[in-house]
Amino acid sequence: MLLDAGPQFPALGVGTFARHHHHHHHHHAAVAAAAAAAAEMQERELSLAQNTFVEPTHMAAFKLNPGGGSGGGSGGGGGGGGAGPNGGAGASGPHDLSPPGQTSAFTSQAGYPTSALAPHSAYSGAAAFNSPRDFLFRGRGFAEGSAAAGGGQHGLFGPPAGSLHHHPHHHHQLSHAEHPQGHLLFPGIHDQHAAASQNTLGGQMRLGLPGEVFGRTEQYRQVSSPRGDPYTAAQLHNQYSPMNMGMNMAAHHHHHHHHHPGAFFRYMRQPCIKQELICKWIDPEQLNNPKKSCTKTFSTMHELVTHVSVEHVGGPEQSNHICFWEECPREGKPFKAKYKLVNHIRVHTGEKPFPCPFPGCGKVFARSENLKIHKRTHTGEKPFQCEFEGCDRRFANSSDRKKHMHVHTSDKPYLCKMCDKSYTHPSSLRKHMKVHESSPQGSESSPAASSGYESSTPPGLVSPNSETQNPNLSPAAAAVSAVHNVSSGASGALASNFNEWYV
C-alpha cells in the first residue's frame, strides 16, 4: 500500500514519504517507515502546518524525497551508491541523513546536498529526521558537533566549512555552482568566527518571526538594546554633548570579515570620544596680576563638579558664597545661600543633572524647578489660574500668568525704545520690533533714524560726502544718503541689538 502525505501539507512543500521500491528486499522496510512517518505527521504535525510562526517561504526550502534513496542497497558501499531520481545520495553516501536501509527523508529543494543541512556528514547518520518537526525544531541536531565542522556553525544560514566546497561531485546539483553563496536560505546571517561556533543554536529555532535573529550566540546576549533607557540616554547625551553616543546602524555585509559580529554590529555602541573638561576657577588669594585659573582637566562631568564643590566652593564653614569662575558676569557679587551658588556654577560647567523622565523627550535641565515646570507640558497640568474675575485662563507657571494679567489692567510695561509705543506682553513687543527692522525707507519720518537705528544698507558703503561728490544725485537719493549719515554718526551712542533689550 502506498501512502502519500503530500496533499495533507501543501504549505510545507511535503511530497510523498516513500515509494514502492524496485528492489524486493527493501519493500517491507520502506512501507513500514512510510507508515510510521505518515502516522506521526497526522498526529503531531497538523498544527505545524497551520502555525502562523512558520512561513511558507521558509518551509518551501525543504521537501521530502519521493525516491531519493533507491540506489542505497544495490549500488551502495564505499563510494556512496547510486543516486535517486531527484538527486538524493545513496544510503551509504556521505550526504545521506538516514541510516542504511531507510529511505532518505529530506533533500533540499534547491538541490543542496543533504550534508549542507547538518553540521557535518559524520553526524548525519545518527540524526535521522523522520518528520519536518524533528528536522526543523531539533536544535540539538544542528548544534552538536559544530566544532568538528571546521567553524561552520549554521548550515541553514550559510554553507559551513566542509559542507559545499569539499564535495566537487555534487556541484552539478546547484543551479549556480559558481556562486553557491547565492543559495543561502537566510543571507542576512554571515559566517562568524570558529571560536563562537560551540555556542550556536543551543535552543529551539523560531522561523518566520520578523526581527528575530536565527542562531543567536551566547557571546552577544549581553549586548544592550539600542532602545535604551531614555532617562540615562538623555542625561549622557546632554551632559557630554561632544561625546558620540550614537549607534552605528550600518551592518557590514562583507562575507570575508569573519571577525565582525555581523547582524549584531548595529546593536553595539561605538566608543565615546574622549573630552577634557577644564576648571577655570580663580583662587582669590593669588597675588599674581593677572590671576591664573585652576586649569585642572577632567574626563567626566562628575569629576569636574566634585572638584569644584570640594576644592573651591567649600563646605558649611564658608560664609561668603561668591563665584570666582573666570569671566563670570557677576563680578564677585555674593549669593545669599550656598545652594544658589551651586546652581549658578552649572552655568559655567554646563552640568544639567535633571533630565526629563518622559520617553522620547530628551531634554535636561540645570535646576529641578525648571524640570518641574517642563513636565507640565507632558502632563497638561496648569495650576496657576488667572485671578481676574470672570477669566478662566490657566497657566503652567506663575510668570506666564503674570504676563497675562496685564491684559486685564491698563499696564503696558513693555516699551519700545525706537518709538513711543508700549505693550502688555513681551511677545507683542517683539512683533513690533520687526516692523522697525524691516522698514528702512520709513525711517525718514520715524524716530528710528535719529535714534541710531541702522538701516538695511551698511553705513560704511555710503560716502559721507556723497551729496557733493555726485551733483547728479536726485533729491530722494540725497535724503536717503543723509539718513545714513545721521545713522552712522549716532550708532555708537545707542545699541541696535534688540535682543539685548528684551528677553
From Swiss-Prot:
* Keyword line: Activator, Cytoplasm, Developmental protein, Differentiation, DNA-binding, Gastrulation, Metal-binding, Neurogenesis, Nucleus, Repeat, Repressor, Transcription, Transcription regulation, Zinc, Zinc-finger
| ZnF C2H2-type span | 277-312, 321-348, 354-378, 384-408, 414-436
Q: Please give the tissue specificity annotation from the record for this chain.
A: Expressed in both animal and vegetal regions of the oocyte. At blastula and gastrula stages (stages 9 to 10.5), expressed throughout the ectoderm. During late gastrula to neurula stages, expression gradually diminishes in the midline region of the neural plate and increases in the anterior neural folds, and continues to be expressed in the posterior medial part of the neural plate. In early tailbud stages (stages 22-23), expressed in the dorsal forebrain, midbrain and hindbrain. Subsequently expressed in the telencephalon and diencephalon/mesencephalon boundary.
Presence of the UniProt keyword Coiled coil in the record: no
Where does the signal sequence lie? none
Compositionally biased, Low complexity: which spans? 438-456
Q: Which InterPro entries match?
A: GLI-like, Znf-C2H2_ZIC1-5/GLI1-3-like, Znf_C2H2_sf, Znf_C2H2_type, Znf_ZIC
Compositionally biased tracts (Polar residues): 100-112, 463-473
Instruction: Set out the biological process GO terms recorded for this chain's protein.
Output: anterior/posterior pattern specification; cell migration involved in gastrulation; central nervous system development; negative regulation of DNA-templated transcription; negative regulation of neurogenesis; negative regulation of transcription by RNA polymerase II; neural crest cell fate commitment; neural crest formation
Chain segments carrying region Disordered: 61-112, 146-175, 427-476
- Basic residues compositional bias: what residue ranges? 164-174
Q: What turns on expression?
A: By zic1, zic2, zic3 and zic5.
Q: What is known of its domains?
A: The C2H2-type 3, 4 and 5 zinc finger domains are necessary for transcription activation.
Query: Could you tell me which PANTHER family the record lists for this protein?
Result: GLIS FAMILY ZINC FINGER 2, TRANSCRIPTIONAL ACTIVATOR CUBITUS INTERRUPTUS
Report the sequence similarity comment from the record: Belongs to the GLI C2H2-type zinc-finger protein family.
Name of the featured protein: Zinc finger protein ZIC 2-A
